[in-house]
A protein has these predicted regions:
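Mobile amphipathic helical/loop "lid" adjacent to a hydrophobic cofactor/ligand pocket
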Residues: 61-182
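Conserved Rossmann-like nucleotide-cofactor binding loop
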Residues: 11, 33, 264
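N-terminal glycine-rich dinucleotide-binding loop that anchors FAD/FMN and/or NAD(P) in oxidoreductases
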Residues: 41-67
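Mid-domain catalytic core of redox enzymes
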Residues: 232-363
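Conserved flavin/dinucleotide-binding core of flavoenzymes
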Residues: 42, 99-100, 319-419
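Glycine-rich FAD pyrophosphate-binding loop
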Residues: 20-44
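N-terminal Rossmann-like FAD-binding beta1-loop-alpha1 element of flavoenzymes
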Residues: 2-27
Length: 419
């Protein structure tokens, strides 16, 4: 068959990798660079040039089996990294990093604070109750806030631990985390070892930057894939005998189309979406997130002992977007003499231009009861009218989910052929 793939993120690339040997495949990318959220930047400094990741950064050996399988097929091994998490409250001055006892009490006065000891006690209690809840039937409509209220967790615990951690993971505000679907939240935390003090998965980065797997995949595909960059698809018309893609350069005709882009983008391209497509794709919301690559240490905790891989900065109120600074020196294992590299998501104040290397905008899916219901209706639209939908937003929003959703589509196309 002649198949069009729209979007060159992890989902689109996985579809291309699996289909290009058996079908005629054309991959359309609106931008100048393939990879989607896999975005590695070369930063030239007096100490040399450094490849720094700004989008997709880490994966682990427990919950990324499909992505690790893809890397293995490409001959790419992982580089071990440290995953740690800190919280800094500029209003109160509180900061801690849960990686070790030294970093946990980087702020020595916390040793004398009953509220801080209470926080540690509530973390243990939350982990225990979360595991217990997972052994029972979970209400699909329950939210994280319902769980916190039912078990009477303190506002201090919510604002200084569980909500910031969730907000950092899903790039959401604290308010959005309160509405987060409880089943999805608890299962994610369990699968990632976040309900345990020990026995956590080993995390990895791609050596040389995450773009290396994109380069390897495209090199291996070679001329089996027709990759078209700077080629935004304006409209998709579907008819009984095929699919027509309309671009600035003209029209292109295919037997099937795979939308490996965001749900909102896919819906906007459809010339005549069905009612189900409008409902399902339209119910998955997206949030715009600003990202700054810089070298300003003021976005990390004041005490270097508290510096973590992920550093959450609390703002007043719950509505502000998640402000997280990734310490790329820790995450990418840069040598001790390397300059400091930080990637800050949604800075809550201007980052000093003297330290800024580059700025980006990414969009991330919003997870709430509405999107949770939409995910469950995916099969209503997948494979209908020669159209297929994949992307990390169909599951938990991470690289593994992009691969998983793509493999769903590949299997669906194979099954449709057999019929």
């Amino acid at each position: 068959m002649n198949i069009a793939i729209i979007g060159s993120g992890i989902a689109g690339l996985t579809c291309a990798w699996r289909l290009a040997g058996h079908h005629q495949v054309t991959l359309f990318e609106a931008g100048a660079t393939p990879g989607g959220h896999t975005a590695t930047v070369d930063v030239a400094t007096p100490q040399g040039t450094w490849a720094i990741d700004t989008g997709f950064i880490v994966y682990n050996d427990r919950t990324y089996p499909r992505f690790m399988g893809l890397l293995s097929e490409l001959g790419i091994g992982g580089q071990k990294t440290q995953m740690s998490f800190s919280v800094h409250n500029p209003a109160s001055g509180l900061e801690y990093n849960g990686h070790s006892l030294t970093s946990l009490f980087a702020q020595r006065r916390n040793l004398l604070k009953p509220a801080f000891w209470g926080l540690l006690s509530e973390i243990v209690r939350f982990n225990r109750l979360a595991k217990l809840a997972l052994t029972e039937a979970l209400d699909p409509g329950a939210t994280l806030e319902n769980f916190l209220a039912r078990h009477r967790f303190s506002p201090f615990f919510a604002r200084h631990y569980i909500l910031p951690m969730g907000a950092a993971i899903w790039s959401s505000s604290l308010q959005e985390m309160r509405r987060f679907p409880l089943p999805l939240f608890l299962r994610f935390f369990e699968h990632h070892g976040l309900l345990d003090i020990r026995d956590r998965p080993q995390w990895y980065v791609v050596p040389g930057g995450s773009r290396e797997y994109v380069r390897a995949l495209l090199a291996r595909l070679g001329d089996r894939l027709d990759l078209r960059l700077n080629a935004p698809v304006q409209q998709v018309d579907r008819h009984p005998t095929g699919v027509t893609l309309r671009l600035a350069s003209g029209e292109a005709h295919f037997d099937q189309v795979i939308f490996a882009c965001h749900s909102a983008q896919a819906l906007a391209m459809l010339a005549a979406p069905t009612d189900s497509e409008r409902e399902v794709l339209g119910d998955i919301g997206w949030q715009r997130n600003e990202v700054v690559l810089h070298s300003d240490p003021r976005w990390l905790p004041a005490r270097q002992r508290a510096w973590a891989s992920w550093n959450y900065r609390l703002s007043d109120g719950d509505c502000a977007r998640a402000c997280v600074t990734y310490n790329m020196n820790i995450l990418q294992g840069l040598p001790a003499d390397a300059p400091l590299f930080c990637v800050t998501l949604n800075p809550d104040a201007p980052v000093d231009d003297r330290y800024v290397w580059q700025r980006f905008v990414y969009e991330h899916p919003l997870f709430n009861p509405q999107s949770w219901s939409a995910q469950l209706r995916r099969e209503e639209i997948n494979g209908q009218q020669r159209s297929w939908y994949c992307g990390a937003y169909w599951y938990n929003g991470f690289h593994e989910d992009g691969v998983r959703s793509a493999l769903d589509v590949v299997q669906g196309i194979a099954a449709a052929e057999d019929n």
